[in-house]
Amino acid sequence: MINLRKTHPLMKIINQSFIDLPAPSNISAWWNFGSLLGACLIIQILTGFFLAMHYTSDTLTAFSSVAHICRDVNYGWLIRNLHANGASMFFMCLFLHVGRGIYYGSYLYKETWNIGVILLLTVMGTAFVGYVLPWGQMSFWGATVITNLLSAIPYIGTTLAEWIWGGFAVDKATLTRFFAFHFILPFIITALAIVHLLFLHETGSNNPSGINPDSDKIPFHPYYTIKDALGLILMFMVLLLLALFSPDLLGDPDNFSPANPLNTPPHIKPEWYFLFAYAILRSIPNKLGGVLALLASILILLIIPLLHTANQRSMMFRPVSQTLFWILAANLVTLTWIGGQPVEQPFIIIGQLASMLYFLLILVLMPLAGMFENYMLKPKW
C-alpha cells in the first residue's frame, strides 16, 4: 500500500511541513519558539472562545460579566487566568523569537521576516484591543490614551480618532467594536502564520552557524517533534505556574476597579509587553514626535535586513556584534522598566537616553560593527 501521508492531498501538506521536512541538524533550543508561538496561539483561541461565550461587550455589563466568569462559570477563573497570562507567554516567546532572528541573521530570509514583523504588529493590536475588554480603570484609560494618539496626525487626526471611537470619546461603541476586532484578529494571525511558514519552507531553516545547511539535513520527525514537545511541556508548566499561583502578578491593580471616565488613575500604563514602546513614546515631549518614535520602534525591524553589513550571516563568530546585541537586549529591559515608572526625574532622562541608544544601536552601531568585523577578518599581509 502506498503511504497515505505522502499521497493524500491534505496529509501531504502536513507531512511536508512537520514530518518529512528536511531540517538542519544543528538548530538549537532558540529554534523552539516558532512552535511555542503556534501553541500559544491555539491556547489563546481556545480559552478566548470559551470566554466569549460568557462575556458581554456592553459598558454596563462588561466588568460584571468578567467577574461572573471568574465566580460562577465552571473553571471560568482558570480559563480567564490562562488567557490573560497566555498573552504574557505569547509576548515572551515573540520577543525571544525576534531576538533569535536578529542574533542569527534569520532576517536575511526577507519574505519570512517581513511577514513576521506584520505578525508582531497584528498580535500587538490584538493584545491592545483585548486589554480594553474587561472594562476596568486601566482598560478604559489605556484605550483613551492610546487611541488619542491618532489625534496627533495632522489635519485628519481628530476625525480619525472619533471614527475609531464611534463617538466623541471611548464609550459603548468603542467597546463593542474592540470586541469584534479581538475576535477576528486571531484568525487573521493564524492565516499570516501559515504564510510565514510557507515562506520559511521555501528556503528552509537558518541555523546557529549561519552557514548553508543543505549538506547536512535530518527529518523533522522524530528529532524536532520530540524537541518541540519538551519546549511545549516547559512553557505550559510556566504558564500553569503563573495562572494557578500568581495570576495577577503581571496585571495592574487598577483594573480591579470598574471603568470611571471621571476618575483618572495616577499612573496610566499598558501591560508589561508594551512598556518598552510606551517608554519611547513618552521620551519625546512632542505628541506627534512621540507617535512617530513609537511606530519607528517597531517598524525599524523591517529595515534590519538592509542594515546587514557583515560578510557572515550569524553573530556566532562576531564578538563585537554580540556585545552590541546584548547591550540592545539590556537597553530594552531598561526601557520596559522606565515605561512602568512615573514621569519624573531621573526616569525621564534615563528613558530619553535609552530611547536614543535603542535607535543608535540598530541604525548606526551594529552596521558599523559588521563593517569593522569584515575589516578585521581580511588578511593583513
From Swiss-Prot:
It comes from the Eukaryota. Heme b b566 binds at residues 97, 196. Keywords: Electron transport, Heme, Iron, Membrane, Metal-binding, Mitochondrion, Mitochondrion inner membrane, Respiratory chain, Transmembrane, Transmembrane helix, Transport, Ubiquinone. GO terms for molecular function: metal ion binding; ubiquinol-cytochrome-c reductase activity. Heme b b562 binds at residues 83, 182. Its cofactor is heme b. The cytochrome bc1 complex contains 11 subunits: 3 respiratory subunits (MT-CYB, CYC1 and UQCRFS1), 2 core proteins (UQCRC1 and UQCRC2) and 6 low-molecular weight proteins (UQCRH/QCR6, UQCRB/QCR7, UQCRQ/QCR8, UQCR10/QCR9, UQCR11/QCR10 and a cleavage product of UQCRFS1). This cytochrome bc1 complex then forms a dimer. Component of the ubiquinol-cytochrome c reductase complex (complex III or cytochrome b-c1 complex) that is part of the mitochondrial respiratory chain. The b-c1 complex mediates electron transfer from ubiquinol to cytochrome c. Contributes to the generation of a proton gradient across the mitochondrial membrane that is then used for ATP synthesis. This is Cytochrome b. It comes from Paramurexia rothschildi (Broad-striped dasyure). The lineage of its organism: Eukaryota, Metazoa, Chordata, Craniata, Vertebrata. The gene is MT-CYB.
